[in-house]
């Protein structure tokens, strides 16, 4: 049934829709059979279709259209015959993904008069390959040729098993019918090839569209180019089908030193150099009413000369206008779609590229540009040209008409007769259109657990008296210069001498930096880094508790990488492997050794450090496995004289490390055992270590080991909101870190032990709330529960043990009892809550907190109350930045 009106078009769409629904269920084997049969039929009809196109449109050259028809069938088939376009495209068992292809549906194919048959063949074939249907809106000047090409492909497809109405067309095209087709509700995609007006109409239709537009291809010929090849290529391309290919050359810009040689070569090989009145006459016929004169499109050079009122030999290949102006006032500077060519002289390569940029911007932005140069010896020019040209195809030493369509002069450029121009040209794609653009891809993503890790120092030496033995490794590894980083107390009391004496005896030069204080500052760290830069150690030894080890780690970073920006190092991350800022590689200049003299921080085995900017008061918590020491020395002889308060605070810090690591969303079977063993050692030995001190060296040693074991656990499983809040309490009110954790941990357990939390932290392996069960497992492991106890009872017994332990270690019952004034606390609690939420530790907590919930925990802990869920709803949080903005808005109003 012919399509000549809206009703007939609607009926066609209905038939095509039915056919496409059937075709959408075909297998890859069936589709490939149809694709091959259709390509064979189109190739077989290449000559009659070419003759028909020229006869009907009055444009182009039969022999060249034969090549285009052959290309559209043979090259397209060869390029895509093995491409999977149906069903499962790929399956990745490792990452658990399946990619499935689905057809788009019905495509509206817009076909230009310049390439009426080859474009129809191309679009039909890629539609068939992707299980789509297509309805063509041909150009009125070439409708019969376009529709015949479509019919040949359709009949071959039907003979190979395709549904009978899979390809359709408008028999009597009009603007009304073309618009109706583009806007039809059953059209799923517009595939438009044509001039700017048609492409704009496609993109304005409200439908997904792939459209291409005008080209205004400039060619730069530099002084290193092979002139004979350059001229031959331009002539071959520009005369191909009388220049109707949109990628064909429109201007040549020649460097001055070879301009005359290029000019002479054109003149002696069929190029006609327009002189005087001839140039003006051709300029006058190129444009008509400010637009390209359709009368010259696809016409031979001698006919265009006749239109201009003069004659040239019939053998003339192209008309060349030597012009100077590079703007819209110059007709030769426009796209001409005919064997007419502008020729510009450039003073040098840079000037030539600048002119080419302007020509592209005038009317061919996004399409194609070309450079003739010595591509083997001028890579910088090739790169520069590529950077400057805003075109999707940048061809080197290539005839643009044949090169732009792909697979002829470069075999990785996809073959296509629809060339995307990207956003520059108002297109949605910037590559040569192919089957991949006509399918929807579905991704089936199976749940997969994150790859986890267990990272430790290369060596961990432990047991009483291990320090001098472990230092033998420094000597045997050939280190010659050791920088010891410690605090003044340890230095004055001879702890550093225990290291320097061993090293000096072996001929290792030593230097001691002992200015580290609690909460190390950037100024102190920079001072230590300056010493490192002058002393040039090949090993840095941190001696002390958390502060000297933190300072030493950061000095290590500054020594190895002085260009480091701490704001970037401290940037929060959701996944340490995907962080925006990548830590630099460490250990190039020096090895890091950590010798711990306290039992709590675990810093000797962790990738964490904290530094305070003393100019702003801003704390920078750093976390990266690059900061993990190369060696840890855990010698309990160094903690025998540790004061009771430090024993208590450090011990409860270690308890908190183990508790938070065990319930963390990153907890694994590798970290669980260490967390549980650390808790067992601490339960059995911390009271004795606190009460008996050096009189019970076994208890002191086991607590010391437990702190390091807990450090290993949280180095890999990370921590939670107890540490998030403790960091902020310590910073604001100068509460010792271990004490802050001890004050908060019971209420944090009450908060986390909820099987139906407000929000669960999103982490693949953490598939449901587990904290409640895991706290109960801790109680079981510590022997706190009895057979028959329910989960709630086990958690209460765990809390009872913690409260009893804290009481025995002299821990205050509340933040208020720890000496924080109520007015001061309440003035800062909102900011503390927000800052705790933003702490790096928060992300691994099993329960993703609301800021109001953190505020409630802080308030309850301040007053010594047990946290309960029901209290949270009444809590209002005033975020300082928001309050400030609201006040400013009211003031401005």
Task: Describe the role of every protein-language-model region.
Residues 78, 84, 149, 523-637:
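Glycine/threonine-rich beta-strand-loop-alpha-helix active-site module
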Residues 260, 268, 605-717:
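Carboxylate- and glycine-rich phosphate/diphosphate-binding segment that chelates Mg2+/Mn2+
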């Amino acid at each position: 049934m012919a399509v000549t009106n809206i009703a007939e078009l609607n009926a066609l769409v209905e038939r095509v829709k039915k056919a496409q629904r059937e075709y959408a269920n075909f297998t890859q084997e069936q589709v490939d059979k149809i694709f091959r049969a259709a390509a064979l039929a189109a190739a077989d009809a290449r000559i009659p279709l070419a003759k028909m196109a020229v006869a009907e449109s009055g444009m182009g050259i039969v022999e060249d259209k034969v090549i285009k028809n052959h290309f559209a069938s043979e090259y397209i088939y060869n390029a895509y015959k093995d491409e999977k376009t149906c069903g499962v495209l790929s399956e990745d068992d490792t990452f658990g993904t399946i990619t499935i292809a689905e057809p788009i549906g019905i495509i509206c194919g817009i076909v230009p008069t310049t390439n009426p048959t080859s474009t129809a063949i191309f679009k039909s074939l890629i539609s068939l390959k992707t299980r789509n249907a297509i309805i063509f809106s041909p150009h009125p000047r070439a409708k019969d040729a376009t529709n015949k090409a479509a019919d040949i492909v359709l009949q071959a497809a039907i003979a190979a098993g395709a549904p009978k109405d899979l390809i359709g067309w408008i028999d009597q095209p009009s603007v009304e019918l073309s618009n109706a087709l583009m806007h039809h509700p059953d059209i799923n995609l517009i595939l438009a090839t044509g001039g700017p007006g048609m492409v704009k109409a496609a993109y304005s239709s409200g439908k997904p569209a792939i459209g291409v537009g005008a080209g205004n291809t400039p060619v730069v010929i530099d002084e290193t180019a092979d002139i004979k090849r350059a001229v031959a290529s331009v002539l071959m391309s520009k005369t191909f089908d009388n220049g109707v290919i949109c990628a064909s050359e429109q201007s040549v810009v020649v460097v001055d030193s070879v301009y005359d040689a290029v000019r002479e070569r054109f003149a002696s090989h069929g190029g006609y150099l327009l002189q005087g009145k001839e140039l003006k006459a051709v300029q006058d016929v190129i444009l008509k009413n400010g637009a390209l004169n359709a009368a010259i499109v696809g016409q031979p050079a001698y006919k265009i000369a006749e239109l201009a009122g003069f004659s040239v030999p019939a053998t003339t290949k192209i008309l060349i206008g030597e012009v100077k102006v590079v703007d819209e006032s110059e007709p030769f500077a426009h796209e001409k779609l005919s064997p007419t060519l502008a020729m510009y002289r450039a003073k040098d390569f840079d000037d030539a590229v600048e002119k080419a940029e302007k020509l592209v911007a005038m009317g061919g932005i996004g399409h194609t540009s070309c450079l003739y140069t010595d591509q083997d010896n001028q890579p910088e020019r090739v790169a520069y040209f590529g950077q400057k040209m805003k075109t999707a195809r940048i061809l080197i030493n290539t005839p643009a008409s044949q090169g732009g369509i792909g697979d002829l002069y470069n075999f990785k450029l996809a073959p296509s007769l629809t060339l995307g121009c990207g956003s520059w040209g108002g297109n949605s794609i910037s590559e040569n259109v192919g089957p991949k653009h006509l399918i929807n891809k579905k991704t089936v993503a199976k749940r997969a657990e994150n790859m986890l890790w267990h990272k430790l120092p290369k060596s961990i030496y432990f047991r009483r008296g291990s320090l001098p033995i472990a230092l033998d490794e420094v000597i045997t590894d050939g280190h010659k210069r050791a920088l010891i980083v410690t605090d003044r107390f340890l230095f004055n009391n001879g702890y550093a001498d225990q290291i320097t004496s061993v090293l000096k005896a072996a001929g290792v030069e030593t230097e001691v930096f002992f200015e580290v204080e609690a909460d190390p500052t950037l100024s102190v760290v920079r001072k230590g880094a300056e010493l490192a830069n002058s002393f040039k150690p090949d090993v840095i030894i941190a001696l002390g508790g958390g502060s000297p080890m933190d300072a030493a780690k950061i000095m290590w970073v500054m020594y190895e990488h002085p260009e480091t920006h701490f704001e970037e190092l401290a940037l929060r991350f959701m996944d340490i492997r995907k962080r925006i800022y990548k830590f630099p590689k460490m250990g190039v200049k020096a090895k890091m050794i950590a010798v711990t003299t306290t039992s709590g921080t675990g810093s000797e085995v962790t990738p964490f450090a904290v530094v305070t900017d003393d100019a702003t008061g801003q704390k920078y918590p750093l976390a990266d496995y690059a900061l993990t020491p190369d060696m840890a020395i855990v010698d309990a002889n160094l903690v025998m004289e540790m004061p009771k308060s430090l024993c208590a605070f450090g011990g409860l810090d270690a308890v908190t490390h183990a508790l938070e690591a065990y319930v963390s969303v990153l907890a694994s079977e590798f970290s669980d055992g260490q967390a549980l063993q650390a808790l067992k050692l601490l339960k059995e030995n911390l009271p004795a270590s606190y009460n008996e001190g050096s009189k019970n060296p076994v208890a002191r040693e086991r607590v010391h080991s437990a702190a390091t074991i807990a450090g290993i656990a949280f180095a890999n499983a990370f921590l939670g909101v107890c540490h998030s809040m403790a960091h902020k309490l310590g910073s604001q009110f100068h509460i010792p870190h271990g004490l802050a954790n001890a004050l908060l941990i019971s209420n944090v357990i009450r908060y986390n032990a909820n099987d139906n939390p407000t929000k669960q932290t999103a982490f693949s392996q953490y598939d449901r709330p587990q904290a409640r069960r895991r706290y109960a497992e801790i109680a079981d492991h510590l022997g706190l529960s009895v057979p028959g106890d329910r989960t709630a009872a086990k958690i209460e017994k765990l809390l009872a043990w913690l409260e009893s332990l804290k009481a025995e270690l002299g821990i205050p019952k509340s933040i208020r009892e720890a000496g924080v004034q109520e007015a001061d606390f309440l003035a800062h609690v909102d900011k503390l809550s927000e800052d705790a939420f933003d702490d790096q530790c928060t992300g691994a907590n099993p329960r993703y907190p609301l800021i109001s919930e953190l505020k409630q925990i802080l308030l309850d802990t301040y007053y010594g109350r047990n946290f309960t869920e029901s209290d949270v709803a009444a809590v209002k949080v005033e975020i300082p930045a928001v309050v400030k903005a609201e006040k400013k808005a009211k003031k401005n109003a």
